[in-house]
C-alpha cells in the first residue's frame, strides 16, 4: 500500500482534521456495490473491485468515502448540520501503481449557508495540503456544474439533452461526442434488430430483460458495471435524443462558454458580460456564484490565485454545484492532491427522508507524501 497509517503525514493529517470540528468516523472496508455503481460515475465504476456474498448481493471494496459516509449518516438518523472526517484506505483498479491507497477528507452535511460551507470546504482542503507541503507550488482550479446547467437552460435545450450534457460535464472527450451527436455529425453504430425494435417502442422492461439474458449467456454478471435497466434506459434515451438537433449558433455559444478560463476575481464579471452580450438569463446562478466567491475571499483565500474553468468538472456523477481541485503545479499529468465539491441531491438518492445539502473533499495521501518528499 502507498502511504502508511504510521507515517508522520498520516498523523499530521489526523491532527488537522481534528482541529476542524469534524467527527472522525470509521467506515467498513466492504460496502454494498449498488450505490457506487448507480451514482459514482463511469470512471470510478470501471475501477471498483466487485465481489458477491453467499446470498448473491453485490459487494465491493471501498472505492471512496463520500457515499458510505452519507449512508452512515442516514443510518444513524443523525441531526444536521454535521461534519464528518475520515482517514483510511480506498481500493481502485489502476493500470499503473498501487490499487490500495490512503485518503483523508471532510464531508459537511446540512449546512444552511451554501456559500460559506463551499468556501470552508475549499479552505479546509487547502489548509490540510499546506500543513503537509507548506512550500509546494499549488494550482487551484474551480468549476461550477450549476452554472453549466443554467447555461443549458438559457439556451433552451430539451431536458433530455441537458441531462446528457450534464453527465458529460468535466469530461472533454465525452462532451465532444455529445456535441457531435447534438449537431447530427456523429454517426451511431446500428443496434441489432432484436434490440432496435424494443428501443424504438420504448420498451424499457423488455429491453432490460433481453440485455440481462445476453449478458448471462456471455458470462457477464449483470451487476458488473452498468445494470441492464440502466443500459436499456440509456439506449432508449439515445434514440429519443437522436431525433433532436440544435441550431449551430446556440452550439457555438455553448462552446464559447466552455472555453472561459479566468482567475476567480474576474470570473463573475466575465460571465455576466458573456450573458449580457448573448441575451442569456443566468442571473440566478451567477448570484450564487458571486456569493460563493465573496465567501472564499472572506475565508482568506486569494481569488486571483484560483482559476475558474467553465468546462471543469470532476468524474463523479453526484456533484451538483461547486467542484474544485488542488494540484501540484509542477506535475501537470498526475498532480491532483485534493478534490471536492457540492452534492445536494446525493443523500436523497441514498434514501434520506428529507433534502440534506452536502459538500466535501478528499486528499490523496500518496501524492501528498511524494510532494512533501517523505521517505516511504
UniProtKB/Swiss-Prot annotation:
Pathway: Amino-acid biosynthesis; L-histidine biosynthesis; L-histidine from 5-phospho-alpha-D-ribose 1-diphosphate: step 1/9
InterPro entries: aa-tRNA-synth_II/BPL/LPL, HisRS-like_core, HisRS/HisZ, HisZ
UniProt entry keywords in alphabetical sequence: Amino-acid biosynthesis, Cytoplasm, Histidine biosynthesis
Recorded superkingdom: Bacteria
Cellular component aspect of the GO annotation: cytoplasm
One example GO MF annotation: histidine-tRNA ligase activity
Subcellular location: Cytoplasm
Amino-acid biosynthesis as UniProt keyword: yes
Cited SUPFAM superfamilies: Class II aaRS and biotin synthetases (SSF55681)
GO BP terms, alphabetized: histidyl-tRNA aminoacylation; L-histidine biosynthetic process
Function: Required for the first step of histidine biosynthesis. May allow the feedback regulation of ATP phosphoribosyltransferase activity by histidine.
Note: This function is generally fulfilled by the C-terminal part of HisG, which is missing in some bacteria such as this one.
Quaternary structure and partners: Heteromultimer composed of HisG and HisZ subunits.
Stated family: Belongs to the class-II aminoacyl-tRNA synthetase family. HisZ subfamily.
HAMAP family: HisZ (MF_00125)
PANTHER family given in the database record: HISTIDINE--TRNA LIGASE, MITOCHONDRIAL-RELATED, HISTIDYL-TRNA SYNTHETASE
Protein name: ATP phosphoribosyltransferase regulatory subunit
Organism: Brucella ovis (strain ATCC 25840 / 63/290 / NCTC 10512)
